[in-house]
Amino acid sequence: LLTKNQFALLSYIAVRPADEPALSQRAIAQGTGKALGTVNGLVKQLDAMGYLDGANRITDAGRAALAPYRVDNAVIMAAGMSSRFAPLSYEKPKALLKVKGEVLIEREIRQLQAAGIDDITIVVGYMKEKLFYLEDRFHVKIVINEDYHRYNNPSTLMLVRDRLKNTFICSSDNYFEQNPFELYVYQAYYASLYSTGKTDEYCMVTNRKGRITGVQVGGSDAWYMIGHAYFDRSFSEKFTQLLEREYDSPVTRAGLWEDLYARHIRELEMYIRKYPGGIHEFDSLDELRAFDSAYVTNTDSYIFDNICAVLHCTPDSIHGIIPIKTGLTNLSFKFSCGGRDYVYRHPGAGTEAYIDRPAEARAMEAAKALGLDDTFIYIDAARGWKISHYIEDAAILDYHNDEQVDTALRMLRRLHTSGVQLDGRFDIWEKINGFLDRLQGTDVSDFTGMQELHETMCALHARLKGDVVPLCACHCDSYNPNFLIDKQGKMYLIDWEYAGMADPGCDIGTFIACSDYTTEEAEQVIARYLGHAPTGAELRHYLGYVAMASYFWFLWGLYQEACAKHVGEYLYIWYKYAKQYAQLALERYDQEEAFA
């Protein structure tokens, strides 16, 4: 094996074009950054080993000695959505952003190829079809990661683990001012920059030789991971074994590959590669604007065009963009413009299958007129994007705060008795059957008890259908996160995607179905909504709609899971309430029929 200094000198000579004149020792010293005396000694060693020919040219034996250090390939990770880079990442993969006149991933590919690395694999996922052109244009290989939306980047490396050898691991959204790639690399490393002051990045601790001995998230005045990494064959072999062994663990799938490395840092030998600067990861549009002034006035974004048209502003006045993680179906972000804060709602993929956007637009206009949602500014009835005022430090309704619950119930009552005619109809049974149709052929609805649950709900539907309850304007998604309270205590009922003419039981049923109420508390809520003690017919009807709403949202949740969107604990709550309240309601229907 070569020493590090021998490798540095030999690899420097090896990558020079063969038709160029031989280098002097002084030129080698300048090119490698080593002292002239050191170079003189190294040249003598390499001459004696037969790796140089006496005229500072590499021999065949020298190339053979370098062969174990030659880079085999590169993997570019381009599967993720980069949600922090809203809103541009809503429209195309971040890899396709044009920075300083060049598409990020194209620049990276060209830099790899300029270094002599032609075996390049790109792992795609989010908006994958927009990246397929790279295969023909640059002769790269494409691998599709179908798990990009539910697992982190270990899922990408798992797909290409058989390709991990002497391999550069790259992110598709890095911008390197200078080409960092080399045809020969001595050992595994991670690129790093120095942070003066605090940083939230992965910070490294190293020993005297530069081996990484510790990694922690966040630090101060520290070298942190950024940009590319390099796996040598030894690292790749050990890392692949660990990845295969631990991949099924939720900790591994949810974390980054760097987290797996950090847990096994003693087994995995990797060194720090320090750079003075010139490596960029743009985590927000504001960061990109600071680097490329073209984005101040021209974002090449239809979302920005939408905002400018509604707020009568220019792109450079839109700033402070922060993704909002609440909500299971849509993508939203907060932004500032003209001294005020707003929210832009971008319709989630697939929502057009079950949401009537024109009906939502009419409902939002009605809600504003009724004083139920003063946040609303504009909605595009055809495409579903929406702009609203942002409520600073908003709180959501507390199901166990009597004053808040009474306010929410009064708002629902105001809507139900308003006489407003909405364009759409929310037939909950029709919606239930729609989700059942969509779930056909999926695994998520194939479980013990599902058929029995559906038969129970069919029986309940037959009873509810016999109740004579006039349809009225309903919100149909009236659970506590949609009741926002500002700092002055004013409540807003937001998100009218499901609104339509419906049985008022849809709203009360949903309100209770998403709570942790006992059945006694649920009955009290029904009475508070009605403003009087419910009759037997009223109580059974509203209890039945708690079950029906729970079943609807349970199926909705299964559909989200089938689309790889994690619903969480609500799924169990809805399943439990569907069974529990269906039994209660059916018992009351049976009792009254027996009495009659």
Show the residue positions of the predicted features.
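Conserved alpha/beta core of the MobA/IspD/sugar-nucleotide pyrophosphorylase nucleotidyltransferase superfamily
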Residues: 63-74, 224-310
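N-terminal glycine-rich phosphate-binding loop and ensuing alpha1 helix
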Residues: 65-128
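Conserved beta-loop-beta/alpha segment of the NTase-like Rossmann-fold superfamily
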Residues: 129-202, 206
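Conserved core of the sugar-phosphate nucleotidyltransferase
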Residues: 177-252
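ATP/Mg2+ or Mg2+-diphosphate-binding catalytic cores
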Residues: 292, 296-300, 556-596
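An alpha-helical support segment within catalytic cores of ATP-dependent transferases
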Residues: 302-319, 420-476, 487-488
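ATP-binding pocket architecture of kinase catalytic cores
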Residues: 322-429, 436-452
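Active-site activation/catalytic loop segments of kinase-like enzymes and analogous catalytic loops
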Residues: 505-534, 547-565, 584
